[in-house]
Amino acid sequence: MSKKNLIAGQSGGPTAAINSSLYGVVSEALKHTEEIDHVYGMVNGIEGFLNGTVLDFQKALPGEQLLALTWTPGAYLGSCRYKLPESLEDPVYPKLFQKFEEMNIGWFFYIGGNDSMDTVSKLSRYAEKIGSDIRILGEPKTIDNDLVNTDHTPGFGSAARYVASTVREITLDACVYEKKSVTIIEIMGRHAGWLTGAAALARKYVGDNPLLIYLPETDFDVEEFLQKVNAAFEKNCNVVVCVSEGIHDKDGTFICEYDSAAGTDAFGHKMLAGCGKYLENLVRSRLGVKARSVELNVSQRCSAAMLAGTDQQEGILAGEFGVQAALNGETGKMIAFKRQSDSPYSMKCTLEDVNAICNEEKTVPVEWITEDGSDVTEDFIRYARPLIQGTVNVPVGDDGLPAFVYRK
């Protein structure tokens, strides 16, 4: 059997663990020299591939240099927000597959979130339509943890660890004065509140801050919010509140839109930011207390200092498992995680039909949110805590800073 080449790409927002999945794919592929010749990377995803920007991993990261991917945040290959046309009759598809043929590609891997799985779905369906034998698989990635048919996704654990740690640090900072104050922390999450829920992991004891946590899975009422903040002063004169960027009222209007309209991205998703600042001003004007807001922003997804060992190892495992599955002939699938136990925590990799995953969204179960919508339950804590475990020792360079790997 003649050898073929494998190509991998990254797409969407980066995470602290997306390069671990890339490492898993590349390192496993390099072991199978009897079947796989070259291992290529698409620079800036499908968009870059269409423009002819490709690298050869054996040349770009030879030998032990490849390992540095496992502690490097961001997306080593670069990313894109390119949306493939809905119609498989569009000329971009034969163009892509002609390029695959020219490069002798036998296996295609795309590492990303929901929109990336949409790409995997379209490419695998087109391959089936034309009778191509290219095996096309998706590697999950998203800090939002909103991919369906998987217990969780690589990237979420590290982002959740960052959120919990940062909320604990902000709480310590907020509580230095014996004077009423409210600190509102705005956390990523448009429709799914997994990351914001992780703020509950910051608590050291019952009644500790954050005293209020609001997710987008439930309706947000401004007046009820003000009442709860006022009541929270009975527990602590310094109240920390965590809110998802996508909290909305009963009519579906985002709270951030109370001040201004939100724009949209290439996939039609609203770009949200600003609910924390709105609530800060509201608390200050209505309750007459010191108030401030903190937007965690992109730091949630790029902190190598908070890279969770569990997250890193599962990212690598997913990459390795995917290559093994592809070599066994699997295609049109996404690598998924199936939890086997909470304590001690254990999981295994499985394969799921990517067509049942793309364009769907997994939200926090309503039964994991308190009835009044201002906190998460113990079930959420039990689910999330194992995912933030483990410390990764990131090598330090001569300049005293993390020794990340950079694409040249």
Language model segments and positions:
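N-terminal phosphate-binding or glycine-rich loops at protein starts, especially the Walker A/P-loop
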Residues: 1-54
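Gly-rich Lys/Arg/Thr-decorated short loops/hinges at beta-loop-alpha junctions or inter-strand turns
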Residues: 2-9, 69-82, 141-151, 178-181, ...
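Short glycine-rich or small-residue beta-strand-to-loop segments that form or flank ligand, phosphate
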Residues: 5-15, 75-81, 106-112, 138, ...
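Glycine-rich beta-alpha junction loops
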Residues: 44-47, 141-145, 187-192, 216-222, ...
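C-terminal non-catalytic interaction/assembly regions of soluble proteins
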Residues: 257-408
